[in-house]
Every structure is written in C-alpha cells, then in structure tokens.
Design a protein with these regions (language model features):
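Cysteine-centered catalytic environments shared across enzyme families
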Residues: 1-204
Length: 204
C-alpha cells in the first residue's frame, strides 16, 4: 500500500512544494519506507512508498524517465510485470530497475492510454507526458486501489485518500446525495461521488 498525490495547475501559479507536503503528510501511513516529491512548474507529484517488489532505491517514486520524458506515481501491484517487461525489452526498451513502476512507464510510452488493457493487477497511477503536455490517470478495473480528485478552474488535484485532498482549498460541504447513499447502500458511495462535494472518485 503506497500513497500518491499530485496537482496540475491551470492558472498563473506553479505547484507549491508546501501544498504537496501537506497532502503527503496525510498519506504517510500508507508508505513508511520512503517519500519523494517532484515539481516542474505547473505540475507536481508526491509519493509515500511501501516497498514490495524492487526494494532498492531504483524503485523510488515519483519515477522520472528523462529519455521518454515521462513521470509517474503509482500505487499497487502489477502481477504480470515480468512478462510485460520481457515483451517491452523485445521491442527495444531498456530498464534500470526491477520494479513494476518502470514497466508502467515503458508500457505507457509504447501503448499510450491503451497500456491499461495490458496491466493485470490492482493499481492507481498518474503519468505526466511532457512531450504532449498531457496528464493521464487510471485505476484498476475492480477499483481496488483508491484514487480521489478535485477539479476546479485553478487546478486538478488528486490523492490516494480524501484526507489528503482536504488539506487543499475546495468545497468541504456534505454531498446530500452521497450521504443518502452512504446510509442506504451499506456505507457504499458509488463513484464518482463522495461524501464531500469538492471531492470525487476516479471511476475504475
């Protein structure tokens, strides 16, 4: 269980390191092994790591591939990462780690958004594609790994839990429809709703 967060700003402001730190503090229990931040102007990622597959520092995140101009934060486990890694090596890609994180970066570069069709596992991740100035965010098909977001006219902000997003400026009022669902559906609020108006869940 790791924790991821990030922000992409649309206004004249750059992403604040303090803002990322605030979100990461609410994710710390999800990833006690290491933490990392990456900021580049209007985009920034934070990560709290629980080491599972590649225990070395080569698996630390946010993971930046300068050659492919991709940056990734990822929470989860890709069960078929070894076979995907072999497949991508056969297509000319090289790897500097043994992590499933790096496999996602290469898979995204090769297959684009369709990379999720090849991933067998539980995951939530976000990729910044510098070349195309595009942010891509995804969850596993069953929605095992959580991912929440806030979208305003100033920024798109995401995190592994709602507590992290509550450190940001957003509408913190209660969503009455979600409250009704919470009380009547055995505590389940279907995506994209959450109990907070300013926070949504990424659909699986």
């Amino acid at each position: 269980m790791c924790g991821i967060c990030g922000q992409f700003r649309f206004d004249s402001e750059n992403v604040s390191s303090k803002s990322l730190t605030s979100m990461m503090s609410k994710l710390a229990r999800r990833g006690p092994d290491s933490s990392g931040k990456w900021l580049e102007g209007k985009i920034g990622f934070g990560h709290q790591r629980l080491s599972i597959i590649d225990l070395s520092s080569h698996g630390n995140q946010p993971m930046v591939d300068d050659l492919l101009k991709l940056t990734l934060v990822f929470n989860g486990t890709i069960y078929n990462y070894k076979s995907l890694r072999s497949q991508l090596i056969g297509k000319g890609y090289s790897f500097s780690s043994h992590s499933d994180t790096e496999v996602i970066i290469k898979a995204y570069h090769y297959w684009g958004e369709d990379c999720v069709k090849y991933l067998d596992g539980m995951f939530a991740f976000c990729v910044w594609d510098q070349s195309n100035q595009k942010l891509f965010i995804a969850r596993d098909r069953m929605g095992i790994k959580p991912l929440y977001y806030n979208l305003s006219n100033k920024a798109f902000t995401f995190a592994s839990n709602s507590q992290a997003l509550l450190t940001q400026e957003l509408d913190k009022s209660v969503n009455p429809l979600a409250l009704q669902q919470q009380l009547s559906l055995h505590g389940v609020v279907p995506a994209p709703n959450t109990i907070i108006n300013g926070i949504q869940k990424v659909k699986p």
